[in-house]
Amino acid sequence: MRFEHENLPQRIXFG
């Protein structure tokens, strides 16, 4: 998982 460029809003949702 090296795509934390647009994974900011998804990270909250996912995590």
From Swiss-Prot:
Keywords: Aromatic hydrocarbons catabolism, NAD, Oxidoreductase
Top-level lineage group: Bacteria
Reaction equations catalysed: 3-oxoadipate + NAD(+) = maleylacetate + NADH + H(+); 3-oxoadipate + NADP(+) = maleylacetate + NADPH + H(+)
Cysteines joined through disulfide linkages: none
Molecular-function annotations in GO: maleylacetate reductase activity
Biological or metabolic pathway of the protein: Aromatic compound metabolism; 3-chlorocatechol degradation
Enzyme Commission designation: 1.3.1.32
GO biological process: catabolic process
Family designation: Belongs to the iron-containing alcohol dehydrogenase family.
Protein name from the UniProt record: Putative maleylacetate reductase 2
Source organism per UniProt: Rhodococcus opacus (Nocardia opaca)
